[in-house]
Design a protein with these regions (language model features):
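Bacterial Sec-dependent N-terminal signal peptides
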Residues: 4-26
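A short beta-strand-turn-helix
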Residues: 28-47
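Short pre-active-site segment immediately N-terminal to redox-active cysteine/selenocysteine motifs
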Residues: 45-47, 52-56, 121
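Hydrophobic beta-strand anchors of alpha/beta hydrolase catalytic cores
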Residues: 48-49, 80, 125
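Conserved redox-active cysteine motifs that mediate thiol-disulfide chemistry
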Residues: 51-68
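Thiol-based oxidoreductase modules, predominantly thioredoxin-like and allied folds used
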Residues: 76-90, 101-110
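Short, internal strand/loop/helix patches
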Residues: 93-130
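Thiol-/selenol-based redox modules, centered on thioredoxin-like
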Residues: 127-156
Length: 156
């Protein structure tokens, strides 16, 4: 029997540790729909950036909430960037299909983009306005996800 362990909340890796008030770093990713998303676009208006892997149970629980936010706020001009921490496109596509998710995502083979933002913990969601991080959500018991994220977006 093989056991696959991917770290979620308790991992500790190298990388940045951005905080509320920091400006998002420069980066560019290609989304699964072929569109290109970069920090310049994310610095114009309200944006929501999520790092995830589909092997992480906490991420799998958070993704449907992100889909609800995406469906509600994309028409209002909020930009969404769902970026894998380090996961192949075929694995993500399979999960998206099985869960009925429609949000574009960027499959990243390595943790390069993730490490511009954080050294540990997924899921990790950054809500930003004009490139400034206004809130950071990780899936911890004291940090409810959907209602709190919605409240922050509504304030911006």
């Amino acid at each position: 029997m093989a056991v696959l362990c991917t770290s979620c909340i308790k991992d500790r890796e190298r990388g940045a540790d951005l905080e509320v008030g920091d400006i998002i770093p420069d980066f560019t990713v290609t989304m699964n729909d072929g569109s290109v998303l970069n920090s310049e676009l994310l610095r114009s208006g309200v944006s929501c950036i999520m790092f995830f892997t589909t092997q992480c149970s906490d991420c799998r629980e958070t993704l449907p909430y992100m889909q609800r936010l995406y469906d509600e706020y994309l028409p209002q001009g909020v930009t969404f960037a769902l970026i894998s921490r380090a996961e192949a496109d075929d694995t993500i596509a399979s999960h998206w299909a099985s869960e009925g998710l429609t949000m574009p995502y960027s499959a990243q083979k390595y943790r390069v983009i993730y490490e511009l933002f954080a050294s540990s913990r997924i899921p990790r969601v950054y809500i930003c306005k004009d490139g400034v991080i206004r809130a950071i959500f990780t899936d911890t018991p004291e940090n409810p996800i959907y209602e709190d994220m919605k409240a922050v977006i509504d304030e911006l």
